[in-house]
Regions:
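A residue-level signal for conserved active-site and pocket-lining positions in enzyme catalytic cores
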Residues: 34, 122, 164
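Short helix-capping/linker segments at secondary-structure and domain boundaries
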Residues: 38, 77-81, 127-137, 165-180
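Hydrophobic (often cysteine-bearing) scaffold residues that line and stabilize catalytic clefts
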Residues: 30, 37, 64, 114, ...
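Glycine-rich, often acidic, oxyanion-interacting loops/wings at catalytic, nucleic-acid
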Residues: 1-57, 182-185
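Phosphate-backbone recognition surface of nucleic-acid-processing proteins
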Residues: 57-60, 66, 70-149, 153
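Low-complexity, acidic/Ser/Thr- and charged residue-rich accessory regions of DNA metabolism proteins
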Residues: 103, 141-187
Length: 187
């Protein structure tokens, strides 16, 4: 679009009015300025993630990049306000609802009540991990394959996002590095 717009604006056969050409030129300039601001903010996020020890540990988790790590730390700090990883996941709205009657439990969809931005970041990260599952640690890859064999891909993605949030909580609260899940050997 950047290369085609000047040609379109100068093309006499299109019979564009002068005011329309001026408007399009102004919009192109605004787009260039917004793109430059986005690139600058991306550089700031990358720099912040490299300088922050918690961010460095978080980015070791599959599906968690600099944007997700910095957003999580900005929102929850060291996550010590949450007693368990499940509480953090619930705060983000990534835990399933539950309906039970007559001693039978039924899990429902996620609540979507928490931090929408963080929930979206973790779900998109989980989506990329599921798409690249063959490149993941053997334990995680095996778990994903088993889940995908039993249920819909979107359910697996949300389940993985929940798991990633819990991993992030553990990394932040325990001040440890991420350890990939190991496939248990059964005889």
């Amino acid at each position: 679009m950047d290369r085609q717009l000047p040609r379109i604006l100068e093309d006499a056969e299109l019979r564009l009015s002068g005011s329309f050409r001026v408007l399009m030129a102004q919009l192109k300039l605004e787009l260039e300025q917004v793109t430059a601001r986005i690139e600058e903010m991306d550089r700031v996020i990358q720099k912040t993630a490299k300088e922050n020890e918690d961010c460095q540990r978080l980015t070791e988790i599959p599906g968690v990049g600099p944007v997700t790590a910095t957003a999580l730390i900005a929102a929850v700090g060291n996550a010590s306000t949450f007693q368990k990883g499940r509480n953090l996941a619930a705060w983000m709205g990534i835990v399933p609802g539950e309906y039970s009657t007559g001693g039978k439990q039924k899990l429902l969809g996620i609540s979507k009540r928490g931090n929408k931005y963080l929930r979206t970041l973790f779900i998109q990260g989980a989506r990329s991990v599921v798409q690249q599952r063959h490149k993941q640690a053997q334990g995680l890859s095996h778990w994903l394959e088993q889940l995908l064999g039993r249920t819909h891909q979107n359910v697996v993605i949300v389940a993985l996002a929940n798991k990633l949030v819990r991993m992030a909580w553990a990394v932040l609260c325990k001040n440890e590095r991420y350890r990939a899940p190991v496939l248990a050997v059964t005889n």
